[in-house]
Amino acid sequence: MHLFDLPKIDGHCHVLDPVRFPYPPEVPYHPAGQEVGTAAYLAQVMAAYGTKHALLVGPNSGYGTDNRCLLAAIAASPGRFKGIAGVANDTPASYLQELKAQGIVGIAFNYALHGLGHYADNAALMARLAELGMFVQVQFELRS
């Protein structure tokens, strides 16, 4: 069987569409040029490679905790995409439930960008995620 005939899932990709969803000004880095990729562009790339599903990760660079672009991409492709959202430590369970209902399966902790201190007070958030059956994706840098 050829590689293109095998079912494939992209386990981590980003959708960035600053024309439809402008970046919040407080986010320290705004991807541009070749770093930008809309949901429509992602669908074309997935079709070209025979990728059936994807886990979309809301990028901390660009959107921070603004999940509108991520949620729009999931809504436009019912059943094809699931998502990892960015949220604040004090995010209430009701908002996490809303995210889950819209296809979000977990949230991201980006220690590489925010550092350890940013997530120091997250025990209550972790408990709310566990109650909802959601997970945490952790991104970090190895420093020697």
What is the predicted function of each stretch?
Residues 1-65, 100:
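An N-terminally biased module of ancient metal coordination in phosphate/nucleic-acid-related enzymes
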Residues 64-143:
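Active-site gating/metal-coordination segments in enzymes
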